[in-house]
């Protein structure tokens, strides 16, 4: 009887022997060690607690463990390793017509697995839940020919491959009817898509490509700016654009002369294409209006002045005409427009064919009318052939009070002296018949500007070159773009 009670059984189960009043915990432990012989190391120290009635305690302890000994459970009482879905599927597939009632499912499970016979854990309720909640089981109404109770249950045709390799121990996935519908729909869509792509004619693709090409071409043509070369007439003069509003503002290019001096004279195709043409459109359609000097002399009064379109410019070279004309913006920066050839080729040269044409550098100021009467004596007389030639060939750039050609262009209330600084080109010898240009950059009162003009007039008289061929420039003290010395009058012939 001692062989049935090993030491591992009470220790593994965590069972403490029942202790009476005469027993102690150590005597019980010693009895357990002596019974199994497992705790040999503890037998010697536990012997000191031994009692004369040791044998009877040992026998009593063995009898005390008798009722709690786990009996070997028969195989029929072990729960089968199948899910309720697998059990129901077994019952349905075992039926001759592949359909069975709920009572038939119960009978099949109890006959096949005896565990469910005596077990009252509510497995029948679990069977009913699985039948209702799983879409793989379909309820079939009972026929009138077969009287009875309850409806039949069968498997969905798409759920026969629900278990892997026919093994009810492993199920692939939870069966859902919508997944089957999705799979079928996806297959149909793929098949239709392949057929559609295969039957699509090549002409439709070509038509689509042509439409895309046309849209791209329209986009490119819409974004391309208007260039001066595209609007030239047969005689070389540039005709102003017709569909542009005169209210558009001209954006002049602002650079220092040093950075632009690296540009060499080239072909007429070197004109910047971002040049605004609204200035020329405005001068061909609207005579501009001049501000009067009653409000005092300021930068606002020397805004960009529009000149008349060159009507009699047949003798003028096309590079001079095609170059853009800008004025002084209401800021302290000097603006210039690079032309086709070298950047600062002057229109103040007597022969207009010098250098193959060039850009212009204008500062058209309305304040020039303040001393135009005083300076008319220093200019070349209007009745000389040289003055007439210059004024005829340069109707836009040199307009004086002694000529009638300025009035023929019909839009100047006050004359302007458009000047080009010749010292950028080192061509002081070719200058003539033009007056100097002043560049006031900040707002000054009337008296200071008048004094500056007087000093320039005196500088013209005392120039080492005669007044007709000298080009003078007067800079205000605040103009730090070129030089910062105290002298305000520079002789262009030095450079």
UniProtKB/Swiss-Prot annotation:
Pfam families: Forkhead (PF00250). Residues 175-322 are annotated as: Disordered. CDD domains: FH_FOXC1. It comes from the Eukaryota. Residues 79-173 bind DNA. Keywords: Developmental protein, DNA-binding, Nucleus, Transcription, Transcription regulation. GO terms for biological process: adrenal gland development; blood vessel development; cartilage development; cell adhesion; cellular response to chemokine; cerebellum vasculature development; chemokine-mediated signaling pathway; closure of optic fissure. Residues 178-198 have a biased composition (Basic and acidic residues). The keyword DNA-binding applies. GO terms for molecular function: chromatin binding; DNA binding; DNA-binding transcription factor activity; transcription cis-regulatory region binding. Signal peptide: none annotated. Residues 199-224, 257-276 have a biased composition (Low complexity). Residues 296-312 have a biased composition (Polar residues). It is found in: Nucleus. GO terms for cellular component: nucleus. Monomer. DNA-binding transcriptional factor that plays a role in a broad range of cellular and developmental processes such as eye, bones, cardiovascular, kidney and skin development. Acts either as a transcriptional activator or repressor. Binds to the consensus binding site 5'-[G/C][A/T]AAA[T/C]AA[A/C]-3' in promoter of target genes. Upon DNA-binding, promotes DNA bending. Required for cell viability and resistance to oxidative stress in the eye. Promotes cell growth inhibition by stopping the cell cycle in the G1 phase through TGFB1-mediated signals. PANTHER family: FORKHEAD BOX PROTEIN, FORKHEAD BOX PROTEIN C1. This is Forkhead box protein C1. It comes from Xenopus tropicalis.
């Amino acid at each position: 009887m001692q062989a049935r009670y090993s030491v591992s059984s009470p220790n593994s189960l965590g069972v403490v022997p029942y202790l009476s009043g005469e027993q102690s915990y150590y005597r019980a432990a010693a009895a357990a060690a002596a019974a199994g012989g497992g705790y040999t190391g503890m037998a010697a120290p536990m012997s000191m607690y031994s009692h004369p009635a040791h044998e009877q305690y040992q026998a009593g302890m063995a009898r005390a463990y008798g009722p709690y000994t786990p009996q070997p459970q028969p195989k029929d009482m072990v729960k089968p390793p199948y899910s309720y879905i697998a059990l129901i599927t077994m019952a349905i597939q075992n039926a001759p017509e592949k359909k069975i009632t709920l009572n038939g499912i119960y009978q099949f499970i109890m006959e096949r697995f005896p565990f469910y016979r005596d077990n009252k854990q509510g497995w029948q309720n679990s069977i009913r839940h699985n039948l209702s909640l799983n879409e793989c089981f379909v309820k079939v109404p009972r026929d009138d020919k077969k009287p009875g109770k309850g409806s039949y249950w069968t498997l969905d045709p798409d759920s026969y491959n629900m278990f892997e390799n026919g093994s009810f121990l492993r199920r692939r996935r939870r069966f859902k009817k919508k997944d089957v519908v999705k799979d079928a729909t996806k297959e149909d869509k793929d098949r239709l898509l392949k057929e559609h792509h295969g039957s699509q004619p090549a002409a439709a693709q070509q038509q689509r490509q042509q439409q895309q090409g046309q849209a791209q071409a329209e986009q490119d043509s819409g974004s391309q700016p208007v260039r001066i070369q595209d609007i030239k007439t047969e005689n070389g003069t540039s005709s102003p654009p017709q569909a542009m509003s005169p209210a558009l503002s001209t954006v002049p290019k602002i650079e220092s002369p040093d950075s632009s001096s690296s540009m060499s004279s080239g072909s007429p195709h070197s004109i910047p294409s971002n040049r605004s043409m609204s200035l020329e459109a405005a001068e061909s359609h609207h005579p501009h209006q001049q501000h009067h000097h009653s409000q005092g002399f300021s930068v606002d009064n020397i805004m960009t002045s529009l000149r008349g379109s060159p009507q009699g410019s047949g003798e003028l070279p096309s590079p001079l005409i095609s170059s853009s004309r800008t004025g002084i913006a209401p800021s302290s920066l000097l603006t210039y427009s690079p032309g086709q050839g070298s950047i600062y080729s002057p229109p103040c040269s007597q022969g207009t064919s010098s250098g193959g044409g060039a850009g212009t550098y204008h500062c058209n100021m309305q304040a020039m009318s303040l001393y135009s009467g005083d300076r008319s004596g220093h200019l070349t007389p209007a009745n000389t052939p040289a003055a007439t030639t210059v004024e005829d060939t340069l109707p836009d750039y040199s307009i004086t009070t002694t000529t009638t050609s300025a009035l023929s262009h019909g839009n100047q209330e006050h004359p302007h002296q458009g000047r080009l600084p010749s010292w950028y080109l080192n061509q002081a010898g070719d200058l003539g018949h033009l007056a100097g240009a002043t560049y006031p950059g900040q707002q000054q009162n009337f008296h200071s500007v008048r004094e500056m003009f007087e000093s320039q007039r005196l500088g013209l008289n005392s120039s080492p070159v005669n007044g007709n061929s000298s080009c003078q420039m007067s800079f205000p003290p605040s103009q730090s773009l070129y030089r910062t010395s105290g002298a305000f009058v520079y002789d262009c012939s030095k450079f």
